[in-house]
Amino acid sequence: MTIGLSCNALKYGGGLERYAIDLARGLADAGVRPLVFARSFDSSVPEYQCVEPRRINVSFLPGKCRDAWFSWRLRAARRAAPVDVLIGCNRVDSSDIAICGGTHLGFLDAIGRMPTFSDRRQIALERRQYARARFVVAHSMLMRDELRRFYGLSDDKIRVLFPPVDAARFTPVDAVRRAELRTRFGFADDEVVLLFPSSSHERKGLPLIEAILRDAGPRVVVAVAGRPPERTSERLRYVGYVKDIEDGYRAADFTILASKYEPFGLVGVESVMCGTPVILPSNIGCCDAIAPSAKLVFAPGDAAGLRGMLDEAVRRVRAGAVRVESGAAARAAIQYDPSVARHVAQLLDLAAEAASDRRNGGR
């Protein structure tokens, strides 16, 4: 069975780019060398050696036309390859297994925006993608609900598979190593540090967090990792782009987000696997994957609720009831198997079923 993988780019990045890299590596470990269809490839990453690259050029087109062109060209490219089962990690209407790491209608609903002409084009492509796929893999219960509500999909088409996380990378450290990391990031021993990893501060809720921070107790700090915030202060600090983000999690006391829309939020799972609990709104998809002991949850946009959770976080830090140093205990707070191997095995099972359906005359 020849497996194809479609993505915007095969490179180290965030979101579905990172997910595609994980799949390429996991498929290689399972003895599968996929054909990867993408707009661009980073040939320097190790995973590039694990795939058969097939570039679909979109660089000559305006940005808003590229999704539709890529999807159109992919139909012919998969036939020519040929590919038995295509896993689509971007908006394409010829995938057998469509990966849903977010929906455009769900995003617009969450931020309260009416669709533009460009939005409607993206939504139409999404509808075709989900309608034509044999399976749609939802990366969270939230995505499953959006697929039902906005796209009318039935449960027999949807499979909920939480995304994988590198368990070898995201692990706790002992107290000595953690103290070294806090020194590296400039965190004082008596500070309560809330890590805010983000490249999209408005969507991730930084304005709400800033407003609450003004009323927080002394020595409470929000450390922004990623894109620089518009302003900083003694309480709102910028620690730069942290490539080894696992060390940022380990140095902090909590990781915090107040996102308006977050289909899953790998940040939450990664942080907990590093032994650091999280403060999250209930609309973040990963809340369903984290044990109650490792999270403080508030209603989306609820300033009073966030203030209460922040007070509770400070109380726990001052009482020494926060950190987890045992890898086993950290993994136990994640309520699914986050390994890449397990996730890929589940996808290969779906691929076998989709291939069987195609041979028998189904989609």
From Swiss-Prot:
What is the annotated role of this protein in its UniProt record? Answer: Probably a transglycosylase. Probably involved in synthesis of the outer membrane receptor for a cellular contact-dependent growth inhibition (CDI) system.
Q: Knockout consequence?
A: Disruption confers resistance to cellular contact-dependent growth inhibition (CDI) CdiA-2 of B.pseudomallei strain 1026b, but not to endogenous CdiA. Alters lipopolysaccharide structure, decreased binding to B.pseudomallei strain 1026b inhibitor cells.
What is the official name of this protein in its record?
A: Probable transglycosylase BTH_I0986
User: Is Transferase given among the entry's keywords?
Assistant: yes
Top EC class, one word: transferase
Checking Pfam families in the record gives:
Glyco_transf_4, Glycos_transf_1
The UniProt GO MF terms for this protein read: glycosyltransferase activity
Q: What keywords are annotated for this sequence in UniProt?
A: Glycosyltransferase, Transferase
Known CDD domains for this protein?
GT4_PimA-like (cd03801)
Q: Which Gene3D superfamilies match?
A: Glycogen Phosphorylase B
> Of which family is this protein a member?
Belongs to the glycosyltransferase group 1 family. Glycosyltransferase 4 subfamily.
Q: Which organism is it from?
A: Burkholderia thailandensis (strain ATCC 700388 / DSM 13276 / CCUG 48851 / CIP 106301 / E264)
- The EC number(s) given in the record are 2.4.-.-
The UniProt entry, under SUPFAM superfamilies, shows: UDP-Glycosyltransferase/glycogen phosphorylase
